[in-house]
């Protein structure tokens, strides 16, 4: 991946929801909400505190995370849709 977020920003790839029901019906995109779950694909170096020291991020590449529904900015890198957001927009890490 050719992107490196700055400071306390994180790049997340959304986890796609199922497009069909258990009975085989296809669900159109207009009938589903965007998922608020994803996988971290890149992280910044961290946020600087008042002393100028860098505070490392709590999330790492590969973490499965939950984030606010309208968090982040959608970007396209290498033909893939990704979200770039501040670490504070992530509400939980799924283990």
Curated annotation (Swiss-Prot):
Keyword hit for Cytoplasm: yes
SUPFAM superfamilies the UniProt entry points to: GroES-like (SSF50129)
SMART domains xrefs: Cpn10
This protein's GO CC annotations: cytoplasm
Disulphide-bonded residues: none
One of the GO BP terms on file: chaperone cofactor-dependent protein refolding
Main location as per UniProt: cytoplasm
GO molecular function, one term: protein folding chaperone
Localization in the cell: Cytoplasm
Pfam family, one: Cpn10
CDD domains: cpn10
UniProt keyword terms in alphabetical order: Chaperone, Cytoplasm
Function, in words: Together with the chaperonin GroEL, plays an essential role in assisting protein folding. The GroEL-GroES system forms a nano-cage that allows encapsulation of the non-native substrate proteins and provides a physical environment optimized to promote and accelerate protein folding. GroES binds to the apical surface of the GroEL ring, thereby capping the opening of the GroEL channel.
Family label: Belongs to the GroES chaperonin family.
Subunit field text: Heptamer of 7 subunits arranged in a ring. Interacts with the chaperonin GroEL.
Family matches, as HAMAP family: CH10
NCBIfam families: PRK00364.1-2, PRK00364.2-2, PRK00364.2-4
Name of this chain's protein: Co-chaperonin GroES
Native organism taxonomy: Bacteria, Pseudomonadati, Pseudomonadota, Gammaproteobacteria, Candidatus Pseudothioglobaceae
């Amino acid at each position: 991946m050719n992107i490196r977020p700055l400071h306390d920003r994180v790049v997340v790839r959304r986890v796609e929801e199922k497009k069909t029901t258990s009975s085989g019906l296809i669900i159109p995109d207009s009938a589903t909400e965007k998922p608020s779950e994803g996988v971290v694909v890149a992280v910044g170096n961290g946020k600087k505190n008042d002393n100028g020291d860098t505070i490392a991020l709590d999330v790492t590449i590969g973490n499965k995370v939950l984030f606010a529904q309208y968090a982040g900015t959608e970007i396209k890198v290498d033909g893939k849709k990704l979200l770039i957001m501040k670490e504070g927009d992530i509400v939980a890490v799924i283990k």
